[in-house]
Amino acid sequence: MKRKYLFFSLLLAGSSLYAQEWPAVRPEARPATRWWWLGSAVDAANLTYNLEEYAKAGLGGVEITPIYGVQGNDKNNLPFLSPQWMNMLQHTEAEGKRIGIEVDMNTGTGWPFGGPHVSMTDAATKAIFQSYQVEGGKEITLDLKVEEEKQRPVATLSRVMAYNADNKQCLNLTSKAKNGQLQWKAPAGHWNIITLYIGKTFQKVKRAAPGGEGYVMNHLDKGAVKRYFANFDKAFKENKTNFPHTFFNDSYEVYGADWTPDFLEQFARRRGYKLEEHFPEFIAQDRNETTARIVSDYRETISDLLIENFSTQWTNWAHGHGSITRNQAHGSPANLIDTYASVDIPECEGFGLSQFHIKGLRQDSLTRKNDSDLSMLKYASSAAHIAGKPYTSSETFTWLTEHFRTSLSQCKPDMDLMFVSGVNHMFFHGTPYSPKEAKWPGWKFYASIDMSPTNNIWQDAPAFFEYITRCQSFLQMGKPDNDFLVYLPVYDMWQEQPGRLLLFSIHDMAKRAPKFIETVHTISNCGYDMDYISDNFVKSTRCVNGKLLTKGGTSYKAIIIPAVKLMPSEVLGHLLKLAQAEATIIFTENYPQDVPGYGKLEARRKGFAQLQKQLPEVASFNETVATPYQKGIIITGNNYQSALEKSGVVPEEMKTRYGLQCIRRSHADGHHYFISSLQEKGVNDWITLAVPAESVMLFNPMTGEKGKAQTRKQEGKTQVRLQLHSGESVILQTFNHILTDVAEWKYVQEQPVSLSLDHGWKLHFAKSTPRIEGTFDIDTPSSWTEIAHPNAPITMATGVYTNIITVPHIPADDWILDLGDVRESARVRINGQDAGTAWAVPYQLKVGKWLKPGDNKIEIEVTNLPANRIADMDRRGEKWRIFNEINVVNLQYKPIPYTDWQPLPSGLNGSVRLIPVTYK
């Protein structure tokens, strides 16, 4: 562990090491990918081949996740954790070390954790309640067997409770139940008898690989979890295999697992009362306040058990073997902040395509809306920031579009969204291992994106990978510098949401926390950034020199309590102590009104009322009021903009006035930003920074260009000149001292007249399947699907557009080649020299250095998507869906062929211009 955490500390010092330059690139800064091992049917030669292809393209890490296999290939499958499988893991680790790729692995196959070693005793568990109404005053005999037949062999009787509502009696009859029958001389009156059986969900591992099939484990049971990891201990020890760099856990998709054998004992110890004495209220369909409070206590207990018995134990186990953990907490029935914070690398997930209305970005009807907006993505990064974790990772581009239709240009906006949300260690979802000899399209995972050498976008993916690497090299440097902490009102959610087991999945968050989501976007639109904080982290936060310092060592200017109804007394009391110690506390819409939960309610309410009396008296939250509170200040009001302004925190004008999105981090000499224009308009103006600066550097992560920015002082604040087209991004680094001997940033001024290159083009194909031979005089730069060749509408290809042009004698500092609408990425050569790769809007490259007087040969190698080819294969009935279990589905998870797909435009698809520019 010392080696890994030493590197973590180096990240924080990175800014002083690499001032004015691009940071040195480490493997963690490069993009990584989930590496699907289909059937674990891998061999040494093809593992080496795949890894070398990944490294050559620019990947820095793989995460092995074994899944279901390929039809007719069972003889080559390697059972998970078998000696043969471990031998291939050893080979992978050795090859990864040789070529500079970090090797992670899933702590299981498919998802969730489980498999053949999970006994029925250790399998995921559920509560089964049954009710019987009886009249007392006589001997009662009841058959208590479980009604659900499949539960009878496995369910165990935990409690038999009797309740008399008239005299409020509660009797524990468990000891009177023998052999599935209750014999009881019932006192007079009407009795409600409730039995609790501990049953099983019978859920099995989804998409399991050979050797990984079996029941999902009970994540809430400490012993079951420990026994699960013991199988890994045994396999690694017996096969003398090194443990991987990181162990991974996918999103929590354990369904219906709402109990564990010792739950009632754990509940009583943690909540201070016996849940079995309140079964009628707990299972009631009508949700009164008592039921809501008891259910809230149940949900908090589930959260505690999941964090302590699963994620914390898993992380401690990994640390014991010199590894770290990476976890997706979303989907779990636990406080997401505390769950994410209990592991080493919190990981968020994108699911679908975001719509930013970026100018010129290709549109595709076969997409689904991204369910992970900024508010969802920030759960993982918030936990990382407040807990002092250096990395936030992401499962990236899951179901961005249908298979075979995802372009690099569509990836960039959602990648930028993740960056501004705090991600700095991305993983593609994903890359299937595919043998070199496999027939195209090779081995595929059922869900997109397919970032692999068998996908045509791999041709120009290295340019995209380099973009990610440059961005992450900065985003891993220094420390987070968000403005506010925002209290996560989890007790309001636990109290208000229907049902009992409450899962915080990506797709349900709009229902789980609509008010909180609105708050997050409001704060962001006011020009600020924030991290969420849980009750546990509030209680460990200190005030140092007027700043809030979290347990992880990250500082914030104030904390926002957003319209919270329920709050534990310890949390409110600590907030008041922070205010007394010079902190700024902002309450919006109302003060907390009550304590959560049911146990010792009246006593806790009395203590809470005493704390409420210490809050400043406020006539109405309609008016924003800042009240001094000993050394600190308490701000109240309904209007976020007004309340946040009174905190004295300076908003970012680039967000409020110009609509840009950004994230800011700090380093020893200042700050650095990642900025993206995720909107229809661009920016070309002086922008006021929220932080002071004596000098500013700009870094273009698309090209590697860098230079000292133009700055000026306006009313004591630093302004920097910024130019961004719609969809573009830039890294901005500030310094507390004046930079000297640094090249200036080149600001572009387009001249009013451009050179149209709309005629004289020829087209041939560097590679194409099915093959297209010869050269075509197409004249205008148009989609090759329109040329007179039977294979043109169906080929997967790299087409080369060639033209000979004469550059006019126009005084210019440089020339920009504007490729217009490119389908989908283009490598440009001018006079035989590589002039760069255009893979995202606005598809422009600076090319002046390669132009010469007289004739100039321009070659544009455009690579399309594989959609046209795969659709043709489906129309011809060619079998390529050769996978077990789920066998490549569409966005709606239906096995629909692509026979109806119309040809997608391919190649250059519009005007090409050469624009003379002046640098200012």
Residue ranges and their predicted role:
Residues 688, 805-831, 838, 858-862:
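Aromatic-lined ligand-binding clefts that engage carbohydrates, nucleic acids, or primary amines
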